[in-house]
Amino acid sequence: MTSSTAKSGVGGRPIETYERKTAEVHSWDPATVDVAQRISDLIKERRPDLVVEHIGSTAVPGLPGKGIVDLSIETEPAEIPGIVEMLYELGFQPQPGPDPWPPTRPMPVGSIEHDGTEYRIHLHVQPKGGDFPRDIAFREALRNDPELTRQYTDLKLGITQGGAVDGFRYTHSKTTWILGVYRKLGFVPPAILPPATIGILGGGQLGRMLALAAREMGYRIAVLDPDEHCPAASVADRVVVGTYDDLEAARRLADGCAVVTYELEHVSAPLVSAIDDGVVAMRPGPYPLKMTQDRLAERKFLESNGVPVAPWRPVSSAAELRAAAAQLGYPVRLKANIGGYDGRSQRRLANPEEVKAHIAAQPIDTRMLLEREMQFRSELSVVVARATDGICVSFPPARNRHDDGILVESVVPAGIAPEVEEAARELAERLATGMGLIGVLTVELFLMRDGSLVVNELAPRVHNSGHWTIEGAATSQFEQHVRAICGLPLGSVELRSPAAAMVNLLGGGDRRPTTIEGLREALAVQDTHLHLYDKRDVFERRKMGHVTALGATTDEALARAREAASHLRWGGPSGDADADG
């Protein structure tokens, strides 16, 4: 709520425009009860049959909160479009931001002036059979249980610490506590149990290993991929051939699925939003995907959550590139804002002459990200899972080595101080909570020479640097992702042996049909495990598989994995090439 001079709504309508703001906790304002009644009266003038309930924190006397007036209407699903249209006529607007409620359960927003103060309004339009009874029960529990109200107050004040925080972080940081109250009230969301079908957007090696883990748990699998012979095809029950922006193909995939997930970030965000319709569970949802597809949005998200990143600037012209490089200091890395993985779509620029040469060869005509190259001690990654109840479980950090942007090796333990490991895992769990993710998130980090951590990038999915978990941890990242998206308890992340290592198997040479040599020698190496991705063709630096090894130390595990990988060669007319590139 903010003080306001008198004004009228857009076009003379009673409801005024809405502005998203950071979250601040204020004392309860009794005027919010009058505001709620005013909104209810406005709606009943148009639709006397509707019951408008005041919910949320402002509906509980004495409970601090953001001051937003939350209201809820329960109706038949077929009535929702007409009710939303009526609300728009009053001046309400569609919910802004990157993570709106689906059209099957919309939340129009607006504001209204009351006694010289502007109040923001969230109006939830809920289908019968949805969460309306739960929200009312939660309100009544808070109204009638002073201890519950005290706990909720302490939680809110603990999140904001007397200041303003990102709205998503504020909302999702309350999830675990709120869902615990729901359970006590008897509202427990049902888990998705076998033999339900899990849909996977993307049929590459990550989709394949997800499918294998899910099938071991008894689930059926449907996959969407442009290639009918993709790696996941041979382990899926159903393959839908289509591109990652083919909405019709995605709907065919979702038909018959209980939950849909994605194995890569190159899926169309509008496509994911369309699937996330409140009928089929889309996990993770559209917001983590949108945010990580856009590097500038990702940087802003990280900074809004108090996470350190490399100094950066947005650039969209040659002049901006020159100025930003001079401000940041060389060397810098110029990255495409959209797209790119495994080091693609980025360029290292070491001095002004290289900037000049790059501009001459490739004019800057779109938004890009320029960041200072970090002088780090090592590269780390943390894979964290967040369940439907908001509980987060993170795997031990892995220490990674890249070659020209492509991951080559990962080892666990990472050989870092206990306090650094604790900080890395806490940071990953905070980010998963801040984006409201359900599933697995991978956080790539730089460990700086002073022991501090800097986030490089995020991936809202299972990740190459987590492959060691298949044999190295009690629960693999793939099984953990399935558990999370299906509403099951998360598994243990304890190591199965003192150390684990993973070495990627990269292709070499020209494109040709896949044949592999040296399997007998590779499999003879003690305590090693070979994973091949069933890719029909091999070519230079293509990820064809990986080797995991266990050992008493990271040196022993890595030596075993390297030895096994060294025996593997890709045959074919263009000549042999080492499997590890």
PLM regions: where:
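Helical scaffold of the NTase/Pol beta-like nucleotidyltransferase catalytic core
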Residues: 2-53
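Active-site nucleotide-donor binding segment shared across nucleotidyl transfer reactions
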Residues: 40-82
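Conserved catalytic core of two-metal-ion nucleotidyltransferases
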Residues: 92-130
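Catalytic cores of NTP-dependent nucleotidyl/adenyl transfer enzymes across multiple folds
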Residues: 129-190
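Peripheral (often C-terminal) accessory segments that flank ATP-dependent C-N-forming ligase machineries
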Residues: 194, 483-581
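Active-site nucleotide/adenylate-binding loops and adjacent lid/helix of ATP-dependent enzymes
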Residues: 291-381, 385-404, 408-434
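Active-site "cap" helix and flanking loop/linker of ATP-utilizing ligase/carboxylase catalytic domains
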Residues: 422-443, 449, 459-511
